[in-house]
């Protein structure tokens, strides 16, 4: 990772504030997995605009039975037309998981492409990838939580990234990846949450 980019990240991270994690009413130290998305946009031949797009923090471990777990998640088939045209991307599918672990509903919340084309072409490719991901997601099975604060919920929402990649190799840590974000759509049951 270039030194200038590391300095940019450090400068931003130094400004972050976190609420403490409490155990027995006292603040305790925790370790989490962290993911950071840095987006760079080329302005001219040697200048870029850089911003922190997203950060996520996930526990290193979760007590068994305290959250929704996957049971059967066969990946979707790569749409043939997309593969022939060199189209790749990530579909963020939001899934409504019922109490029996079946999928009650699924929506392509956002489709990000790894290629640039006309607005119309990108909209069409987002539809193709989104449809393939949602069709397969409706067949998936999950294991509902049986303990903890989520156990008695009527349903659970799960967000799953579905990658359509032509190459089986993912970018390594610190490598740039093309990213053309698509519009974010709400899902019908969001108002109930």
Tell where the protein language model's regions lie, with residue ranges.
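Charge-biased low-complexity segments
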Residues: 1-193
């Amino acid at each position: 990772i270039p030194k200038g980019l590391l300095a940019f990240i450090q400068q931003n991270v130094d400004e972050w504030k976190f609420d403490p994690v409490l155990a027995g009413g006292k603040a305790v130290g925790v370790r989490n997995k962290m993911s950071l998305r840095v987006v760079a946009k080329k302005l001219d031949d040697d200048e870029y605009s850089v911003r922190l797009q997203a950060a996520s923090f996930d526990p290193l471990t979760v007590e068994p039975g305290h959250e929704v777990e996957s049971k059967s998640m066969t990946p979707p088939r790569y749409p043939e037309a997309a593969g022939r045209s060199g189209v790749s991307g990530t579909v963020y599918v939001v899934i409504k998981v019922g109490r029996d672990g079946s999928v009650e509903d699924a929506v392509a919340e956002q489709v990000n492409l790894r290629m640039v084309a006309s607005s119309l072409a990108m909209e069409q490719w987002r539809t193709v990838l989104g449809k393939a991901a949602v069709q397969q997601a409706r067949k998936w099975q999950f294991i509902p939580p049986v303990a903890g604060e989520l156990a008695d919920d009527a349903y659970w929402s799960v967000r799953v990234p579905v990658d359509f990649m032509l190459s089986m190799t993912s970018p390594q840590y610190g490598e740039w990846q093309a990213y053309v974000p698509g519009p974010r759509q709400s899902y019908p049951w969001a108002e109930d949450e």
